[in-house]
Amino acid sequence: MRAWVEQGFALDGVLAAGGGSAGAPVFSAFASGEFVLAHNEEIWRCLAETLENLRTHGAPSREMLWGFGNAVLCTIRRDDGAWLGVFTAPDLGDESAMAVRAKLDAFKQQDFAAPV
């Protein structure tokens, strides 16, 4: 899964990406220069816990957008426990936004039989 995210999200406007799956450690696939702190595993662990807490309490957390001052965080959670977080620039152009959307949709269908 990590290799797929590393390759698939090296897109214009994507600042960082990471994820995890049930029973596997979280990972940071990559982080751009201005978002280098996103390599910190604690960020992804906190995100995993937040998504799980939202799911546990009945919040509609399959697909969410989180707006911040300097970035937007897109999260996808699958039924099998796999999840993905992608930080993008807040002013993503149409072409980049469509490319990110296509990759997020592909993540929902991707078979990650191999370990993270």
Where do the model's predicted regions map?
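Non-catalytic interaction/Regulatory regions outside core domains
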Residues: 1-116
